């Protein structure tokens, strides 16, 4: 929206008086509904996407859409333009409609969250004003379903009897049932025709979170609010509840989707305000090939600098709604373990209304391995001798990108062997074990214990930084561990061909909060049937 200023001295003085008297009210009114915590928050194998379309478009004067006036180089907008309904569905009962495609990764996708937003500019004497909280949605050529926002309507007075509004409602079940493909939204309440002060506009957007078990884990967060940015102003918000991994991310490891109402392709930087219309993430202005740094909010629907074409109508300038996805893994200040993102909006003399933000950041889960080896103190090994010492070494590391928590090793001793008391040592482990340290067998405060359960002897070793008796510690990426203990073969060892012994390491990751497990087996003895041992949880 282009803001016009009076040049007469009296008018300027009056304007200054009004702004001074009501400056506090004006600033606070810019945030119509604040961005609180995320409306969706999860760590899952999957990600998010956002799609939508305009519901109004400018005509060329001959009844056709002004398709060629859009895009980055737009010279006209919806201000004082004749805006008419888009209606693509061919259904008599709808007065407007447009479609866009939900594109999902290959394979099986489960929709975990889907929320539909719609809105526009409307007069309170418009016959559809009372219905602004209701729209219709369908998949492909199926039957329409009614979506009612209830009380979930945000709006602000623009001038006189004209309002900017958005409404929203959960449609997770509907999208999960219907899956990927073309969705049409109809009967969005807006005003048509020509008006100044920004022009008429309308549209819809659908934000979707999906789970796909073939994909890596991601931290997915969705936020929404309703903010008015206008008149050469800036507005800052902070999005909390983020869950960045503990190690740096690559450019493609994090992406942001955002939606805003009423951005104009023809209003950008001026000599008075060279910054133009922008969005900054942690202090860095976001831009790409179709969203210039001085006019990010320009009516585009895009992904990483390319226009999205899977929509009907497929316009370059929606003249009322921006839906843009951008990689933000590098260059936008998302540091390891960040829990918040600072966003700043600015404008030249445009007016726009930021709404949805969604972030997906690839998690860096741990990958903890366990290897087990055994040697005998009798070389060469021809057969297992009576009362022979077997020396077991358990080792491994965290080869993943995230920290492993609560790391515990459990080793169930085969019934044919006898643990050698006092032989348990931690040879190396984070948290101060740079050299071999013998541990007591008692269940006490140190990092190891030996006990018996239902006739089975087992060892528990708590490893990692912060490990104490009864509680495993943390293995950071690239950290390793090594423990060792001894067992004796029985007096009748000549009757054994071999002995198989399995150990297990368990723990959890916080990003996502999932358990992990890895086993290692050591086999000793000439070829023959191993003595099996079943792992027992303690």
Labelled PLM ranges:
Residues 1-31:
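Bacterial Sec-dependent N-terminal signal peptides
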Residues 28-366:
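Disulfide-rich extracellular domains of secreted proteins
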Residues 246-250, 379-388:
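Short, solvent-exposed loop/linker segments at the N-terminal edge
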Residues 323-330, 457-497:
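Low-complexity, intrinsically disordered segments enriched in Ser/Thr together with acidic residues
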Residues 346-373, 482, 489-538:
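Extracellular/luminal low-complexity Ser/Thr/Pro-rich, glycosylation-prone repeat/linker regions
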Residues 371-380, 424-427:
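Short, solvent-exposed loop/edge segments of extracellular or virion-exposed proteins
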Residues 384-413:
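Short beta-strand elements of extracellular/lumenal beta-sandwich folds
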Residues 408, 412-468:
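A surface/secretory-pathway sequence property marking extracellular, secreted
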């Amino acid at each position: 929206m282009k803001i016009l200023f009076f040049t007469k001295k009296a008018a300027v003085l009056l304007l200054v008086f009004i702004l001074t008297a009501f400056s506090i009210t004006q600033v606070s009114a810019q945030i119509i509904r604040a961005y609180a915590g995320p409306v969706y928050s999860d760590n899952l194998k999957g990600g998010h996407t956002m799609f939508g379309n305009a519901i109004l478009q400018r005509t060329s004067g001959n009844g056709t859409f002004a398709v060629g006036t859009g895009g980055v180089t737009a010279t006209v907008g919806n201000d004082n333009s004749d805006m008419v309904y888009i209606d693509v569905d061919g259904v008599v009962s709808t007065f407007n409609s447009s479609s866009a495609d939900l594109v999902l990764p290959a394979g099986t996708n489960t929709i975990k969250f889907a929320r539909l937003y719609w809105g526009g500019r409307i007069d309170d004497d418009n016959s559809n004003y009372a219905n602004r909280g209701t729209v219709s949605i369908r998949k492909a050529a199926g039957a329409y379903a009614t979506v009612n926002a209830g009380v979930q309507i945000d709006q602000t007075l623009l001038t006189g009897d004209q309002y900017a509004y958005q409404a929203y409602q959960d449609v997770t079940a509907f999208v999960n049932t219907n899956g990927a493909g073309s969705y049409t939204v109809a009967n969005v309440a807006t005003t048509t025709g020509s008006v100044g002060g920004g022009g008429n506009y309308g549209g819809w957007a659908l934000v979707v979170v999906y789970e796909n078990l073939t994909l890596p884990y991601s931290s997915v967060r969705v936020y929404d609010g309703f903010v008015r940015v206008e008149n050469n102003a800036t507005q800052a918000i902070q999005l909390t509840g983020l869950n960045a991994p503990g190690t740096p991310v690559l450019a493609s490891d994090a992406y942001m989707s955002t939606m805003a109402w009423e951005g104009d392709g023809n209003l950008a930087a001026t000599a008075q305000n060279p910054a133009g219309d922008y969005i900054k993430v942690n202090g860095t202005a976001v831009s790409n090939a179709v969203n210039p740094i001085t006019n990010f909010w320009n009516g585009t629907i895009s992904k990483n600098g390319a226009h999205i074409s899977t929509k009907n109508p497929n316009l370059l300038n929606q003249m009322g709604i921006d839906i843009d996805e951008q990689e933000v893994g590098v260059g936008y200040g998302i540091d390891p373990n960040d829990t918040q993102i600072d966003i700043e909006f600015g404008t030249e003399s445009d007016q726009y209304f930021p709404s949805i933000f969604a972030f997906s950041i690839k998690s860096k889960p741990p990958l903890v391995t366990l290897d087990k080896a055994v040697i005998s103190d009798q070389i060469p090994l021809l057969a297992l001798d009576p009362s022979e010492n077997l020396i077991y070494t358990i080792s491994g590391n965290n080869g993943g990108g995230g920290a492993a928590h609560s790391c515990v090793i459990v080793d169930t001793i085969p019934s044919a062997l006898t643990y050698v008391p006092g032989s348990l040592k931690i040879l190396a482990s984070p948290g101060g074990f740079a050299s071999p340290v013998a541990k007591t067998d008692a269940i006490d405060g140190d990092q190891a214990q030996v006990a018996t359960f239902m006739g089975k002897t087992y060892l528990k070793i708590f490893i990692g930084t912060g490990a104490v008796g009864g509680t495993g510690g943390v293995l950071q990426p690239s950290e390793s561990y090594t423990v060792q203990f001894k067992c004796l073969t029985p007096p009748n060892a000549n009757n054994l061909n071999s002995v198989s012994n399995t150990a297990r390491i368990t723990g959890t990751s916080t990003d996502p909060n999932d358990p992990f497990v890895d086993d290692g087996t050591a086999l000793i003895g000439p070829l023959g049937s191993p003595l099996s041992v079943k792992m027992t949880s303690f």
